[in-house]
Amino acid sequence: MADSKVTTASLQALLDAFNAHDVNAVMSFFTEDCVFDMPRGPAPGGRRLTGRQQVREGIQSRFDGIPDIEYADDRHWTCGDRGVSEWTIRGTQRTGEHVEVRGCDLFEFTDGKISRKDSFWKIIE
């Protein structure tokens, strides 16, 4: 992401990197001091990962936990230093349980890179 302007194409490229399960490519979109608020965790805001190393480990854990994870049915919006991606995750957890859930990511950008990613998932009951 050499350009500091964030576009929907930037968000699509990020999703493409997720779908390739390429943690290095995914991390190239993030700032050094990035924050990732995961959809699950011990607090109402989910589990917070801070800094590139924690975010990298969290993303790798997602790939490891759902080896065939795929983001599809996506739409993206940007406005200034903010962005939104809407998607459906599909895959199979290591337990054999199939996952299909609708969700979105809210993004904040600094100099064209993600400084904060806040993920939300629908709860299926």
Residue spans of the language-model regions?
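Short, aromatic-enriched amphipathic alpha-helices that serve as compact interaction elements
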Residues: 3-22, 29
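Short solvent-exposed loop/turn micro-motifs enriched in small/polar/acidic residues
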Residues: 9, 68-70, 99-101
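Exposed beta-sheet edge and beta->alpha loop/turn motif
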Residues: 88-110
